[in-house]
From Swiss-Prot:
Pathway(s) per entry: Cofactor biosynthesis; pyrroloquinoline quinone biosynthesis
Keyword flag Hydrolase: no
Keyword Protease carried by entry: no
Alphabetic keyword roster: PQQ biosynthesis
GO molecular function: quinone binding
Any one Pfam family match given in the protein's UniProt record, by short name: PqqD
GO-annotated biological processes: pyrroloquinoline quinone biosynthetic process
Domain of life the protein comes from: Bacteria
Record-stated family: Belongs to the PqqD family.
InterPro entries on file: PQQD, PqqD_bac, PqqD_sf
Protein name as it appears in the record: PqqA binding protein
Alphabetical list of HAMAP family matching this protein: PQQ_syn_PqqD (MF_00655)
Amino acid sequence: MTLALAPTDRPYLPRGVRLVTDRVRGGIVLLAPEKAVALDAVGEAILSRVDGQTSLAALVDQLVEAYDAPREQIEQDVQAFLQGLRARMFLMVAP
């Protein structure tokens, strides 16, 4: 299985995985059973758009509109971030 996402893939958080506000540290955490990942601003910007309905291409389009960075760079960063989460079972993909 390849971890790369196709432009039409629709990433989503699997059952039991959710974004929560960590009131102690003042940030957003990706929480799963017995696992947690503190997110930086980039991770939060990406995952806040992951809903199971939005394709990878549309997600990248939204980020290109929101941030002043080249599309290719955003696409590479999003792909790498989501692949890492997918490898750790924090993310699933609907074709």
